[in-house]
Amino acid sequence: MGAILGKKIGMTRLFNEKREAVSCTIIQAGPCFVTQVKRADKEGYDAYQIGIGERKEKKVSKPLQGHYKKAGVAPGFKLAEFDFKELNQELELGSAVSVESFTEGEKVNVLGVSKGKGFAGVMKRHNFSGGQRTHGQSDRQRAPGSVGGSSDPSRVFKGTRMAGRMGSDNITVRNLVIFKIMPESNLIVIKGSVPGPKNSYVKIVSTKK
């Protein structure tokens, strides 16, 4: 049982013991280091802040440079917080977090930000049917239709489905199975797809059930 921060490399197909092709996602989960230990008496809650990767110091702002130096680790690309219960182990400031805390066949939850689709209409965003394509109709094929009554209630209700920005939502995919772990290269291979585009960062947390 554990938790770690990873970078989505992409998808591929691998073969299992039954020689069946399985779609998998490859995640670069490391090197990860503890950059801050938050305590309830000081920050108000218990959590580990974890950073991933190493980047040039000049690419990081001065406040973050001091933050990383305090932890005694090199500047990273991304920071994320995990609850004490999620990591299920005692960690000190600057200590490494490895993929070896997971096991092959273990179920995990993957948290990430979905792909952004930009401004989308109601047919793409909410799966509306659109208007009829005959009987004199000329320009209403992809229109949303009525959004409310005129005299009563004389307003548009909150939450009415309309066109707008689609995607870039926080998504949690639960109970994915770890297909393979490669500790020497800090890689985790997970069955199925995970949220987000290539090179996006995801949190991998063992399921509580």
Curated annotation (Swiss-Prot):
| A GO-annotated cellular component | cytosolic large ribosomal subunit
Q: Which organism is it from?
A: Pelodictyon phaeoclathratiforme (strain DSM 5477 / BU-1)
Q: What is this protein called?
A: Large ribosomal subunit protein uL3
Q: Which Gene3D superfamilies match?
A: 3.30.160.810, Translation factors (2.40.30.10)
Note the InterPro entries from the entry.
Ribosomal_uL3, Ribosomal_uL3_bac/org-type, Ribosomal_uL3_CS, Transl_B-barrel_sf
**Region (Disordered) spans which residues?**
124-156
Has keyword Ribonucleoprotein? yes
Name the protein family.
Belongs to the universal ribosomal protein uL3 family.
Please name the GO terms that the record assigns under molecular function: rRNA binding; structural constituent of ribosome
* Quaternary organization: Part of the 50S ribosomal subunit. Forms a cluster with proteins L14 and L19.
Query: Which HAMAP family does this chain map to?
Result: Ribosomal_uL3_B
- One GO term of the biological process aspect: translation
Q: What does this protein do?
A: One of the primary rRNA binding proteins, it binds directly near the 3'-end of the 23S rRNA, where it nucleates assembly of the 50S subunit.
Instruction: Give the record's keywords alphabetically.
Output: Ribonucleoprotein, Ribosomal protein, RNA-binding, rRNA-binding
Q: Which domain of life is it from?
A: Bacteria
